[in-house]
Design a protein with these regions (language model features):
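Basic, amphipathic "hinge/linker" alpha-helix immediately C-terminal to the N-terminal HTH DNA-binding motif
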Residues: 1-8
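Amphipathic alpha-helical dimerization/coiled-coil segments
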Residues: 8-62
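Amphipathic alpha-helical coiled-coil segments and their boundaries
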Residues: 36, 43, 70-73, 77, ...
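Hydrophobic stripe of amphipathic alpha-helices that form coiled-coil interfaces
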Residues: 57-60, 64, 91, 98, ...
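Acidic interhelical loop/turn segments
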Residues: 58-79
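Long amphipathic alpha-helical coiled-coil segments
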Residues: 97-113
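Amphipathic heptad-repeat alpha-helical coiled-coil/stalk segments that mediate oligomerization
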Residues: 109, 113-125
Length: 125
């Protein structure tokens, strides 16, 4: 089905990308359509990219402060670093949950109810 393929392609493309948080949010809402191992693998790719970005932000901020750049000019860099830390913490917890085979996933999690499917369809409109 073309619609399903479109969704899966989007999930595969957007989860590892850290520069597009809104698109990643949409992809995360559909990650349940992937096999567990594939979902965990994509999330680990994202984790690596986020960790690298966090290191870059923290290192850049530290260097700027060491050179005497006033903190007031680095507020956004600080904010971005804190947001990256928060996302990394959440993502690592999510990966641990999904990697645990006791965590229901796919068919083992049960089928969505008709009410859920209707609400999901209404939200798309």
């Amino acid at each position: 089905d073309a619609g399903r393929r479109f969704v899966l392609d989007r999930v595969l493309r957007e989860i590892p990308r850290i520069a597009r948080p809104v698109e990643c949010g949409v992809a995360l809402a559909e990650v349940h359509n992937l096999e567990r191992d594939e979902a965990v693998s994509l999330l680990r790719e994202r984790e690596i990219a986020l960790a690298a970005s966090l290191e870059l932000h923290q290192g850049g901020r530290a260097k700027a402060l060491a050179k005497g750049v006033p903190d007031q000019y680095l507020i956004e860099v600080e904010r971005e670093g804190i947001l990256l830390e928060a996302e990394l913490t959440w993502l690592r917890e999510l990966i641990a949950r999904l990697a645990d085979t006791d965590y229901p996933w796919g068919d083992a999690a049960g089928m969505p109810t008709d009410r859920y499917l209707a609400q999901r369809e209404a939200a798309r409109r």
